[in-house]
Amino acid sequence: MQAEIIAVGTEILLGQIVDTNSAFIARELAEAGIEVYYHSLVGDNATRLTAVVEQARSRSDLVIISGGLGPTKDDLTKQTVAHLLGVKLVEDALAMAKIRRRFAINGREMTPNNRLQALYPAGSQPLANRTGLAVGAFYQDPDGADIMLLPGPPSETEPMFREQALPLLKQTYPRSEYLSSRVLRFFGIGESQLVTQLSDLIDQQTNPTIAPYAKVNEVTLRLTAQAPDEMQGQRLLDDLTATIKARVGDYLYGYGDDNSLAAVVVQTLIDRQLTITAAESLTAGQFQSTLGSVPGVSAVFPGGFVTYAASAKHDLLGVSQATIDQDGVVSAATAKEMASRSRERLDTDFSLSFTGVAGPDALEGQPAGTVWLGLAQRGQQPQAKLLHLTGTRSAIRERSVLTGLDWLRRTLQKVK
């Protein structure tokens, strides 16, 4: 089974937006045991789109096209594909009713071009759009490659693919072997060091396979196993995961494509019924914003402090003026007091503090990238950690936040 993915959109071609759909679809297909051989990108031009689709159909069994299903003049995908297949466009009654309701609710008159979103190539199976308006389609061609049409916005593509397209593909293309995969996420170790620690496993890999990926501020490993059924595949992954954890488990913070350090920390706090606050200087609320992006965080995070100026550290948190005068704001003493005072203010179990020099200029004789983190825990003496970071101002702030999260994660692991 050989598949090809085509992304449609001049804005992608010009680099104005990034094509995340192709990566998402490819991952989902791989887990379903469908191999992707080619990725293509084409602008909103009927002639060029026709050529790309014809080429794809000549060399692949399944062609998945995302984008170009909307109501505007440059949305040409379904018209182009219908013409290529020699079929008409027909209306999906349910999709049309949804479009009319949407306009009625908003008190607007529906323009005729919006009907395009409810059309699909005749002979296809329509795919309902739960989060948008443009209907998708799956056309099975007995004499050539099958074609699947998906909308362009990822917020529409992903639920449509997971809920409708993928089950349909699994039913259409049954397989004899089950493909299981697992993503391991690491922080605090570089790709080269991780690969070195696991070099024999990587060099000798057969089944499961190990694929390392260096991402921004972290490294992931994708483990993939082939087996007659899911249970045997998971067993293979469990055995390999245990071997990896025995070597580099200290850096392993979680699993899955959509996981994050913040999500792991928040879930651990929720599970253990512990609370957290923060006092931030150089990160200017970025740590609290990162926590706030995780659903359910309100159960463990009552609020926090952004104390950029020395006066705010003293007036809002109660950091002693003597500490600020003697040690400076970029110091272990200030980081500890920021953490302990903020924890006391909101009566939480933990608090993290961030103070330092994001750059580009030095501060108090300290170069850019000098960062002190403070950690206060109920019933314990506050601690401080010194970081020497490099990069842009935003990179230093982001790395500070992630290091703070990882420090908290490791601390929570020790809490009984």
UniProtKB/Swiss-Prot annotation:
One Pfam family this sequence matches: CinA_KH
Annotated CDD domains: cinA (cd00885)
Top-rank lineage group of the source organism: Bacteria
InterPro entries: CinA, CinA-like_C, CinA_C, CinA_KH, Competence-induced_CinA, MoaB/Mog-like_dom_sf, MoaB/Mog_dom
Family in the record: Belongs to the CinA family.
The protein, known as: Putative competence-damage inducible protein
Organism: Levilactobacillus brevis (strain ATCC 367 / BCRC 12310 / CIP 105137 / JCM 1170 / LMG 11437 / NCIMB 947 / NCTC 947)
